[in-house]
Amino acid sequence: MENSIGLGLIHGLMYGIVPVAPWFVALKRYLLEGKEKGQLAVAGTIAGQVTLLALTFFGWSRVLWVWYYFEPALIILGTMAVVRCALDCWVEQESSLRTAALGPGAGQLASKQEGLYYFLMSFGLMFCNPLHLEGSQTLLSSIPGNRYVYLLAFTVSYTAIIFIFWVTLGYRIFGKAYSGFGAQQTLNRYRIRRVSVGIVAALFLQFANCTPEALVIYHWDSLLAYTPFDGLKHHRTRGYTWEPSSDNAFELSRQSYRATNRAGVSFEQGAKRAVQFKPFWNTETRFDECNQVRERELSNEDWNAEATFHEFQGINQGVLRARSVPFNLYMVPNWEKQEDKNYLLTLRQIRDEMDDKLMAESSPQERFLVSPFTDNLDYEVDYQVYPELMAEKAQTKTAYADMVKLIRGTKWTSNHVHLGDGTDVEMSYAKLHALPAEVRLPWHYPVVKPTEVVVQTSSTDTPDSVQLLNDELQENLHFFSNEPERIQQNVYKRLWEHRTFGKVTPRMIDDKVQKRLDDRVNMRREAYVSSNPTKAK
């Protein structure tokens, strides 16, 4: 599960605690401006919170980009509004939005436009008061390992926080008068100052780690790393680099485990002492903190074993991205959208193995029954899947292209003489299907069934027994068909001795064979006449 539970709890607390200050602002409006305006403020806060949650939960990243572009300015505006509300509660002054003195009929809305204004003010304050930059950057640079565990932890943490706020504030504001403030709720100085203290405490928690460096440098770094502006600046993100060793020897470089999959398995990593972490501003630092389990330094054997499993046997990034689309809880950087060439090569290898089933996995004698006119061509090699075989079969790419042209451009025919019908059937090798524009999962490809080979003889039969059986069959055929050799030659003997395929056509018989056949016919006629003298007459 790696860091899924921790990230779920942190994100749940972040989304739950983010509207702390807006909740206090809604309470302030309820106390100083009336129940109806307080209810609109609470409704706007809830609507803003649900909207922000939906933007991230359903992966509407491009809408979040617009919010992230102006986040520093929104933080400043939200802070000014919350501080003003805290001062109003502390000194018991009338709010700048207050239109009438409290009393009978106080707090009533003058028009629908005014009610919409109160609702939108609380709705916008929800986006102007994030957990400074800590919330958005934690959301951007944290990737859960198990989405189900992550969502479970996120839901538990988030629901608990929201339930507490609703039970303590929202329910009472929408229900009866808040009993904690009594009948004179707007005139109790001590009670109202509690709201001011709560607002200041919420601001202190949210801006505890906020510095000018975080508002400027870190935000600019994340802006270039996670949004469409990443093409404006050449930068390194999410990884570490291999530095040259002390003796200036050449060392291999690897930035992240994702880049490792595209580059292939490394056979030599170099000494661990040559590894130096160089975080690039805030992006790589947060990635190292949140994904230390993923960024491990192992020995060459262990690392190659893990990389080999991940690349050839385990789930790859293409499938992982397809599974996590509905729960895209982080902005997808540019490198996530690139084509994974290794993934396409894996699909091609799967397709090649499926096509190879067309050539039966059997003995050469059995395969010969369904193969083309040559028994030396066992299978066709895809050199893109198996490039190491090119040196054995074709010395150059030109020779390889000629081989492919020959195989693809030749129509193979096979006749079913062994079945006795002598019918020509056109056949060819299966070709790799073009990959679709959007590759989903490997098992979406159609299954190619292997060719069914009919074995004519038992594996326990010997050549002598087969030949003896063939002689007996020929004698029976000679007797029942009267003169079989006038029609065709001995088919079974021809297959056994010569292994030649082709249509069986009538042929002329020489004089010696003709004389022998005539003698046999006369002998049978004389034997028949001598045994049946009456019928002969």
UniProtKB/Swiss-Prot annotation:
Topology relative to the membrane: Multi-pass membrane protein
UniProt KW Membrane keyword: yes
UniProt subcellular location: Plastid, Chloroplast membrane
Annotated keywords: Chloroplast, Membrane, Plastid, Transmembrane, Transmembrane helix
Keyword Transmembrane helix in annotation: yes
Residues that span the membrane, as ranges: 5-25, 40-60, 63-83, 115-135, 149-169, 197-217
GO CC term, one of those recorded: chloroplast membrane
Main location: plastid
Protein name, entry field: Uncharacterized membrane protein OtCpg00060
Lineage: Eukaryota, Viridiplantae, Chlorophyta, Mamiellophyceae, Mamiellales
